Amino acid sequence: MKNTTLCYLEKDGALLMLHRVKKQNDVNAGKWVGVGGHFEEGESPYDCAVREIFEETGLVPAALSYRGVVTFVSDEWETEQMHLFTSDDFLGDDRFPRYTGGEEKETDCIEGNLAWVEKSLVPTLPLWEGDKIFLSLLAENEPFFSLKLVYTGDALVSAIKNGLPL
């Protein structure tokens, strides 16, 4: 099982989102996601989140909230356990453009284009169905949760939160 982190940075009613449009053979191609990535040897979830945020954005979180663990099971890729964080307290140049729909601006992230997206606009973006579930839980300030998302191909076939089907 692979371990990853994902973090949603928040500022002025918007989330920093990454539109995955630059990498070849990307399972997330065309989707909007938070920032994060794979663990390196010896990293804790917190260490990984801080490193990935800095590598992808140049920002350094001053504080992170550990919000949940999401387990992805699929018939097409390795099972993944994703550690989910949020932060509204970070240091650095948060110069990324605001995305309001339509054409987006190119940014220097090698994985895609970064943009601040109004929270109300996020559900209208191309997202994984499971991401819509945990983004909703984050928006509702759900206490720490365990979420299991099962996919057949690109289709979400099962979602279980804290042991109970959704």
Give, region by region, the residue ranges found by the protein language model:
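Conserved N-terminal beta-strand and adjoining loop/helix that marks the start
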Residues: 1-17, 35-40
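Acidic/histidine-enriched, glycine/proline-rich intrinsically disordered or flexible terminal extensions
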Residues: 144-166
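A conserved beta-turn-beta hairpin within the catalytic core of GNAT-like acetyltransferases
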Residues: 26-30, 78
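N-terminal first-folded block
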Residues: 23-27, 41
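Flexible, glycine-rich phosphate/dinucleotide-binding loops
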Residues: 16, 24-25, 73, 91
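Unchanged
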Residues: 39-62, 72-138, 159-166
